[in-house]
């Protein structure tokens, strides 16, 4: 699971270079922290964190095409509940305390979302936009 970010990083970096030639680009990436530290600056990276429970239980709440595709595949399985439980276990592993701490202590700008029932999307976007110098 954890090596897939390393394997795909070269492709992601090449694509980012290509699409960012004449414009600013913001992406959700799986480029590993050690690679980001080598190729980027503090003001070009923002780490977004949330409690493990939020990242696991609310993973499919967003309308991202990739997430909805996965949900559709899981829903089509004969043993849907077991498959969903297994998938959530994998998410919990990926979003473990150890990995959370690695990102929290990465040295990059970090935004921590709280699972308090309040919609903070606009506030989070504003913080990130200010960090990237896109707004005052």
Q: Positions of the model-derived regions?
A:
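Generic surface-pattern signal
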Residues: 3, 21, 64, 75, ...
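Context-gated lysine
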Residues: 6, 23-24, 37, 67, ...
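NTP-dependent small-molecule kinase module
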Residues: 93-136
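A glycine- and Lys/Arg-enriched "phosphate-lid" helix/loop adjacent to the NTP-binding pocket
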Residues: 44-95
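Alpha-helix-centered segments that form part of catalytic cores
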Residues: 3-13, 81-104
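Functionally constrained cores in energy, signaling, and assembly domains
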Residues: 12-15, 50, 55, 95, ...
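Glycine-rich phosphate-binding loop used to anchor ATP phosphates in small-molecule kinases
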Residues: 2-52
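C-terminal intrinsically disordered extensions
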Residues: 41, 45, 60, 130-136
């Amino acid at each position: 699971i954890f090596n897939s970010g390393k394997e795909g990083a070269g492709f992601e970096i090449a694509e980012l270079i290509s699409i960012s030639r004449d414009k600013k680009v913001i992406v959700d990436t799986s480029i590993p922290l050690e690679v980001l530290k080598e190729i980027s600056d503090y003001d070009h990276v923002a780490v977004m964190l949330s409690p493990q429970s939020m990242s696991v239980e609310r993973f499919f709440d967003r309308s991202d095409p990739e997430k909805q595709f996965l949900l559709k595949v899981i829903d089509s399985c004969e043993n849907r509940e077991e498959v969903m439980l297994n998938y959530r276990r994998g998410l919990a592993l990926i979003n473990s305390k150890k990995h959370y701490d690695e990102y929290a202590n990465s040295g990059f700008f970090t935004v921590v979302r709280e699972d308090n029932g309040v919609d903070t999307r606009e506030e989070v976007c504003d913080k990130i936009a200010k960090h990237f110098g896109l707004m005052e």
